Amino acid sequence: MATKKGTRKRRAKKNVETGVAHIHSTFNNTLIMITDVQGNAVAWSSAGVLGFKGSRKSTPFAAQMASEAAAKQAMEHGMKTVEVEVKGPGSGREAAIRALQATGLEVTAIRDVTPVPHNGSRPPKRRRV
């Protein structure tokens, strides 16, 4: 029996004025999730979702596009101001923050929440190119 390719219901519009933009920037990708103050997801996007493949996902331009897409989704739900939490060492950190400001969201605070180990697990070996 063939599976039905269903159309998913569009989520109800959430009226959220302020929120938190979580930017997770890795060496390979940049993920942006915009939540309300309690942490419930309002909108999200990533460089991979937008069609960037391979090494193009890790570029600042891909992070900028992902950030703009997430911001537009959040603004459809009525979001106006965001606090930004940046996590990770990737190259798309600053580009994503600038794109959030350019789309019309007011950035009230920027926090770096990159986890720093207190001498935790052993890091990967150094690359010899």
Swiss-Prot record:
Q: Does the keyword RNA-binding apply?
A: yes
Q: Which GO terms describe its molecular function?
A: rRNA binding; structural constituent of ribosome
GO CC aspect terms = ribonucleoprotein complex; ribosome
Q: Which residues cross the membrane?
A: none
Q: Which UniProt keywords apply?
A: Ribonucleoprotein, Ribosomal protein, RNA-binding, rRNA-binding
Disulfide bridge partners, by residue number: none
| UniProt-recorded name of the protein | Small ribosomal subunit protein uS11
- In its UniProt entry, the species of origin is given as Limosilactobacillus reuteri (strain DSM 20016)
Gene that produces this protein: rpsK
